Amino acid sequence: MSTSEYDSYRPPEPEGGRRKRRRGGRGGSGGPEGPGGRRGGRGGNGRGGGWKNRGADGNREMPMVEDVEFTSYYGRPIVKAPPWGDEIGTYLFLGGLAGGSSLLGFGAQLTDRPGMRIASRMTAIAATGIGGAALVADLGRPERFLNMMRVVKVSSPMSLGTWILSGFGVGSGVTFAIELDRITGEKLLPLGPLRKVLHGMETPAAIESAFFATPLAAYTAVLLGATAVPTWNAAGRNGLPYVFVSSASMAAGGVAMALAPVAETGPARLLALAGTAGEAYAMSAMRKRMHPAEVDPMDDGEPGHKLHRAEKLLIAGAVGAAAVEVGARVFAKKLGGGWKTRAVLRGLSVVSGAALAAASAYTRFGVLEAGIESTKDPRHVVEPQRARLEERRARGITDDSITTGR
């Protein structure tokens, strides 16, 4: 028989030691009632439940199950894994890319950078369309997406995310139509007198898409953190939205570096470098604050491989982006901006931008798959719960869990 730390709270034993059980069974005597009116078949302390309640008045040890190492509930997982696949991973990546590209496009409009403006707006609408299609593919039928727009539930990240995506798509669609009309020489779209109206909506539409850009990049992290999946829930409490926003900035800056002229992508390079620094710091801080059992799925197996690839690509892309920035500011001026210099900088910009975008994609897929893996082993659920319980006990909180006594 074992004891618990709660034995320190029980009153001292009476003088003379422990009372011995009388003969005649587990009751107070052999008859129907023992001394003091206690009935046979009940424990010597007069409480119901027989031998299980011996010592329930606090005067001696109570039978307890000894501490055991938890393995599983009959070999079954405690938390059911969400039925999410590559479609959701694609949406996570493209949603962040769309949001970051929209911000870059708006900035390019304000600073008169037509090449980066066109590239960023085209990227934003393409990412929105493909990401939305991936989301619908995961839902199974398009009407399920429309059904989520029947209500607005502020407490639901999924409900808010539906409206964020829709609002962002409207603004991005208008700016895309304007850019398409410009590229085709105002000949493709039969707008007639409505052309001036369309072009007059450019700034309001750009502001709208920029307004929804950051929420679009961040809400998916809040959505994952609101689930019961161990790794996602812990990551959501410890900074996953910062990881996703930084990753989106890195991806958007990288794609702009790959598609737009080097002379115009200075803001994109700075955004990409800020995103790499932000993701590296936020990811490291998030891991340190999580329980080791919650971090394990992010280090092992295929999710761990993807997150390690993301780290390597992030470093390589950041070094390349910094080299392009230095080259564009220093060497191009000293060397006169010859075609060889421009070709080297252009090639390095494309490769570095692609590496940064790939790093962002690996981060999203790695986090997604790590959460799914964490549901397969009950240890990822039980050990963090026990650690949190012990922490509360150490602070004197013993009345907020069914596993603690009064």
Predicted stretch roles:
Residues 1-406:
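Short amphipathic, positively biased membrane-proximal segments
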